[in-house]
Amino acid sequence: MIQYHDLLERILSDGTEKHDRTGTGTLSVFGHQMRFNLAAGFPMLTTKRLPLKAIVHELLWFLQGDTNIKYLRDNGVTIWDEWADANGDLGPVYGAQWRSWPAADGRSIDQIANIVEMIKRNPDSRRLIVTAWNPADVDRMALPPCHCLFQFYVAGGKLSCQLYQRSADVFLGVPFNIASYALLTMMIAQVTGLKPGEFIHTLGDAHLYSNHLEQARLQLTRAPRALPEMVIDPAVKDVFGFRYEDFTLQGYDPHPHIKAEVAV
């Protein structure tokens, strides 16, 4: 995944020092795009090990419309723990906006169900968009959406997805986001009778936290290995019917994990 290494190198060489909400400090660039051909392998970083279980369970949690960390904790995933309240609640974060966006007239809009039907009925639509950025709810969220809007595009029997991410923690968060949205694209392609095309990742403020710089330099010394293959149970035809057991990552041979602290 040379695209990701190029981003690390750009930030380390051209990044601007910025203050941030967490008080940690960052090196930051503004505006960056990476493209991943999903037919060329599943874009899971090989220059450090990523936890597939956490990536898959978080995505399934989003798709359930859940905003409490109980499901994640029950499945051994702790990535949202720092932001949850004493009851495990996060406020109206991703799952709520994806599955039950509150309309002004009192309706609840299921953006994911709608997008699947739109892709089936009108694949050439330029309105195949899901947004998690709801200005009316942002102040009630434990953490406002970083990956905040994505759009699908159908051409030649293939489904592509472009994600806009306003804030990108490049060392810890972005590798998760790449794998998560690549997987979501594959899942929606399967249930709409399409093949996976590209995942395009567009970043706004792309940053390395000051306590991740040495880890990024270490990662850049490692040579990328062949990408793995993601195999999805072809029997699943409902985007809300997927379970963790329906996904098998074959041929994943990464370099060892690199530890880094999350900026809260």
From Swiss-Prot:
Binding site for (6R)-5,10-methylene-5,6,7,8-tetrahydrofolate: D169, A263
Chief place of localization: cytoplasm
Keyword Metal-binding included in the entry's annotation: no
GO cellular component, one term: cytosol
Catalytic activity: dUMP + (6R)-5,10-methylene-5,6,7,8-tetrahydrofolate = 7,8-dihydrofolate + dTMP
GO molecular function term, any single one: thymidylate synthase activity
GO biological process: dTMP biosynthetic process; dTTP biosynthetic process; methylation
Broad EC category: transferase
EC number per UniProt: 2.1.1.45
Compartments where found: Cytoplasm
Residues reported in the UniProt entry to bind dUMP: R21, R126, R127, R166, S167, A168, D169, N177, H207, L208, Y209
Pfam families the UniProt entry points to: Thymidylat_synt (PF00303)
Active site annotation, chain numbering: C146
CDD domains: TS_Pyrimidine_HMase
Pathway where it operates: Pyrimidine metabolism; dTTP biosynthesis
Alphabetical keyword list: Cytoplasm, Methyltransferase, Nucleotide biosynthesis, Transferase
Protein role: Catalyzes the reductive methylation of 2'-deoxyuridine-5'-monophosphate (dUMP) to 2'-deoxythymidine-5'-monophosphate (dTMP) while utilizing 5,10-methylenetetrahydrofolate (mTHF) as the methyl donor and reductant in the reaction, yielding dihydrofolate (DHF) as a by-product. This enzymatic reaction provides an intracellular de novo source of dTMP, an essential precursor for DNA biosynthesis.
Oligomeric form and interacting partners: Homodimer.
UniProt family annotation: Belongs to the thymidylate synthase family. Bacterial-type ThyA subfamily.
NCBIfam families assigned: PRK01827.1-3 (NF002497), PRK01827.1-5 (NF002499), thym_sym (TIGR03284)
Protein name: Thymidylate synthase
